[in-house]
From Swiss-Prot:
GO terms for molecular function: DNA binding. GO terms for biological process: negative regulation of DNA-templated transcription. The keyword Transcription applies. This is BEN domain-containing protein 5.
Amino acid sequence: MFAFVRFLEDNVCYALPATRVREFHPHSTEDFDSRRVYAVYRSLEEEAGFPGAPQQAQILALAENKTDLENRVMQKKIKIPKISLNYSEQPWEYKDYEDEEDSEFRHFKRADGRKQVESPHKSIEAVVARLEKQSFIGPSHNTRCDEVFSEPFHSVGHMDRLEAAVVPRVLYEELLRSYQQQQQEMKHIQHELERTRKQLVQQAKKLKDYGSLVTEVKELRVLNRRLQDVLLLRLGSGPTIELQIDKSDYCDPEPEPEPEPEIQKISNEEVHLGSGVWVNEEKWHQLQATQGDSKYTKNLAVMIWGTDVLKNRSVTGVATKKKKDAVPKPPLSPHKLSVVRECMYDRIARETMDENEIAQRLSKVNKYICEKIMDINKSCKNEERREAKYNVQ
């Protein structure tokens, strides 16, 4: 078993075998008094009986082996309690002078209650002189008394430094360097966090400005599209005129909620849809009962243009990209397209008031008309194949 002891003479700690402690036979690692002063041999020669006396020491910890003891020291699990100045339980041969020592300690106190440690030797000499006058002490005991009285003062002078004796100096310096390095890293991290926070604030301001600009651009686009629709309606209110539009300059605008359509007028069993567009009254009433936006738009396109016109036209007048040698077909009349959009808007507005839903459903009008044109062309091709087959037979 090993003991971690602190010698009171020089305040140095050692890990020594427990056998070097005189008259000490522990039964476990907890069988010791940390406040008691023991007699410990510092070297093997002293223990073997060579010249040298045991020294006063304080046992701080016990362990089964030296490795466990060193681990406890490195982990700072050892505390140094204050030593008791009562040596009545210690195996020292001069414990008979304990009462005299305590009485002299009480005389070494200042008026404010603190011990006068600066001049212990003068007081010791006075005590020794008084003891010499008494015949029960011989000269051989003077040296021992001097040792007894000087040791408590020596230990009191080191009382404030007990805690520093646990951690080795190398470990302390290493921990201090690590602590200073971590402080520098923490300052650097705090600086980076502050810089990042300022950047985030600036980005948030820019994002807010960008959001307001995007909203303004959207509003301007909506107003521009409505203005285009109004102009198309005014252009189509006169005689029916097919407008010649260059395919490269024409771009069908994205649909938005349209203004309220004109009041439909019934004359000679026909219904006026606006912009000079008239349809059959009976077919118009049948169209109102149609379910689904796709079917409604396709049937309305057939009522306005007819299948013969639709099969030879396109919505935008731009050639398809699916065929390399595709020839662009003439676009449909813009004012008639606006009539289709107005009718579709009037139909959707009766079902919902959500502008987003209205805009989404209106954006599919051109798609439905394109599908109808493709269906007509497909039917015509199938009819031509059947006729060619019959002619061959």
